[in-house]
Amino acid sequence: MGGMISQVMVANYPSRVKSFTMISSTASTPNPFNGPEFKITRQLLKRSAAKDDIEGRIEQSIKLFGLIGTPDTNYDTPEFREDMRSYIKRGGDDGGFIRQMAAIIGSKNRKKLVKSIQTPTLIIHGDIDPLIKVKNAYQAHKLIGSSELIIVEGMGHLLDKNAFKKFQSQLIK
């Protein structure tokens, strides 16, 4: 959702932005053709409807991250569990997660707005992103004519250290 918000900001207030990086984002409203696979949608719904205690919500998060992250990444670690526990306690309930999902699904198509972006733009997307399909990155690259596109081999929707190393130098330019 941060990518969606930043697209609007960069398009509407270009004088306030020197450069723009889109990571795992889309200019389109999510739909069955450009959005997540069914198993991910199902897990998002389970996570959204979680009425579990904190440990149950952590388990739902581990399952979701396992689906949308980089394959073979172990999210069932003490560190991840503690991070999730902290986030869940800080947030209180899952209402924010539900509102975020509703905002994403209800968002307007931003293609025309994104096409107006003149700010130097770097688009980064994982080639195996199951949440926002990689074709969305190619579409954004086409819309923002002066953009640079990096497709990261083996990267899912979530950014991990190994994926970051693959484009770190381009990001720091």
Which ranges hold each PLM region?
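Short alpha-helix in the alpha/beta-hydrolase fold that links the catalytic acid
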Residues: 119, 133-142
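Core-facing hydrophobic residues within beta-strands of well-ordered domains
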Residues: 17-18, 147
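Alpha/beta-hydrolase
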Residues: 40-112
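Acidic catalytic loop of the alpha/beta-hydrolase fold
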Residues: 128-132, 157
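Flexible "cap/lid" loop of the alpha/beta hydrolase fold
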Residues: 18-51
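Catalytic active-site module of serine/aspartate enzymes centered on a nucleophile-bearing elbow/loop
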Residues: 146-173
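Short glycine-enriched nucleophile-adjacent loop
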Residues: 3-14, 20
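Short beta-strand/loop motif that positions the catalytic acidic residue
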Residues: 117, 123-125, 129
